Amino acid sequence: GSNGMGKTTLMKTIMGLIDAREGKITFKNEDITNSSPDYRSKSGIGYVPQGREIFSTLTVEQNIMLPIYTRKKFSFSPQDKLEEIYSLFPILKEKRYVDGSSLSGGQQQQLAIARALIFDPEIIILDEPAEGIQPSIVKFIGNILSNLSKNSKKTFIVVEQNISLISQLNSDCILLEKGILTKKLKSSEINTVEKARDLLSLHN
């Protein structure tokens, strides 16, 4: 959808950052409509907000591990998970001891995704992950999401207007207009800028 159509509001509502005014949110056969964001996170929902929102004074590794510090029990080894994440994002391992503020926009986006992955969530919400990032990094992130979706059975809910990223994801797309779902289609159907403008009302 174009700007102001309710995409970010929907993502924040799913995550529990905004209260739902009507309807119900169900995850793993459980009604989580009134559950806290922390409960939803513990249940297996990760969130990468628009604008990344990393902690600029913490190191890259501290940013990634921050969610771990808030938990006491794990069904996995946090250190093993960290190494797995570093294998996905080598630049983060290279810069693991530098402050988040020193990273480029594309590196910060990788960091935000890595932070969401550290708890091995089943669903990850990403709000405009390609915003303000150079095309090569957009392609890299698209490959990561596509591979994780195929190989680890994770579900990604992605808000995006970047056509190149959408085309990398073999997924269902929905069009939102003022909070209403008006169309459902495959990402392969949005394969040109012209088509996207027709469907999503995008403009230069």
Language-model features, listed with the residues they occupy:
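Conserved ABC ATPase signature
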Residues: 99-103
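H-loop/switch region of ABC-family ATPase nucleotide-binding domains
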Residues: 160-161
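ABC-type ATPase nucleotide-binding domains, specifically the catalytic core motifs of the NBD
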Residues: 19, 60-78, 88-90, 185
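ABC ATPase C-loop
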Residues: 116-117
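Conserved ABC transporter NBD signature motif
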Residues: 23-31, 43, 77-82
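Walker B catalytic motif
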Residues: 128-129
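Helix-to-loop junction immediately C-terminal to a conserved catalytic motif
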Residues: 15
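C-terminal boundary and immediately downstream tail of ABC-type ATPase nucleotide-binding domains
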Residues: 51, 87, 169, 175-184, ...
